């Protein structure tokens, strides 16, 4: 199956993370940042076409620094449990689209919602927020897959800090290779 066929077909399936892929997904897909100031400098330097943040802490940190991502994906959780009330309060200001995505999976609903949100931020210039019931960690993969080139995808990495992925053809191909290893 070619990459374009895969991209089209994957949005109609629930993808299940195989155990043997977990270790590979711990590796960052982009540049690692330890401080929000460095993320902001990177944004100002690269001037990405769109900014998409996946994760409560990075999304809230951007908002507090007056940067509202074009798409914000959050679940009110961190690796240590629920986020604190300050983060919840900041993220609750939005009226998010609510979806279900169980841990270790990328739901069909999540795939379709992410694809639709990317289309909307490109055509209608609207900002979108997605509240995930379950877990949002793996959603960084379809976000990269569906994002336009030169977009910046930011996500929290529980051991390293924030990972910034400047979307190009190479990273899209890497994501497709990873997604092809998922079970249906």
Report residues per predicted region:
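Internal catalytic-core helix/loop-beta-alpha segment
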Residues: 94-132, 138
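Short, solvent-exposed amphipathic alpha-helical segments in soluble enzyme
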Residues: 63-71, 87-90, 144-149, 169-172, ...
